[in-house]
Amino acid sequence: GGQYIFITNNSSKSVNDYVEKVTKMGIRAGYENFYTSSQATAMYINENYPDQVVYCMGTRSLVNELREAGISVVTEVDDRASVVLIGFDTENTSEKIRNTCIMLGRNVVYLATNPDFVCPVSFGYIPDCGSMSIMLKNATGKEPFFIGKPEPIMVNCVLKKLGMKAEDAVIIGDRLYTDIKTGVKAGVDTICVLSGEATTQDIEEGDVKPTYVFDSVKEIYEGLTEA
């Protein structure tokens, strides 16, 4: 059988949170089956800005993930911080936003975990990290460098982790501007499922084209079992 990893841009939760979530859904998965934008961000900071203090506007899970990776993290205005990082912060407050604007007024590196505009919830959608970055741009004029999808960083890390070549992998997702685009950038075949955000019209009219299109993950499974 093949290998699989869930790649998520959601930096608001820990890997353990995701393992628990999919287990409740009846899906067998362990820690090794997930790779998050939080993990990718920690790796990116350690490789590009080692030993620097990072100001983070994010959830406690994101802050803990960074600290566990050996990164010095502050969550208040701090003169030592040379890197500002924002994530999908479901614990956000007006004070956090104010502090982030203060920090962005300084000569700092500005990073963000992911460019997603919205996150699906039970009643519809809520603003994700991409929307928060637009809000901060309107206030400060600053734009971040995004770590997660559609940048190929996460995919390249996963391929290396699995010891797999790009031509032997496929990315499945429902968002053209993150899931599918990251596959295109990483040189990996893609499958767009129409059970989420993307529609047939989006694919026809958009610049990002998936390799394959299926109505749902179930249809992919049925196709594989029949093969």
What is each of the regions a protein language model found here?
Residues G2:
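Conserved phosphoryl-transfer catalytic core
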Residues S11-Y35, A42-A227:
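Asp-based, Mg2+/Mn2+-dependent phosphohydrolase catalytic module
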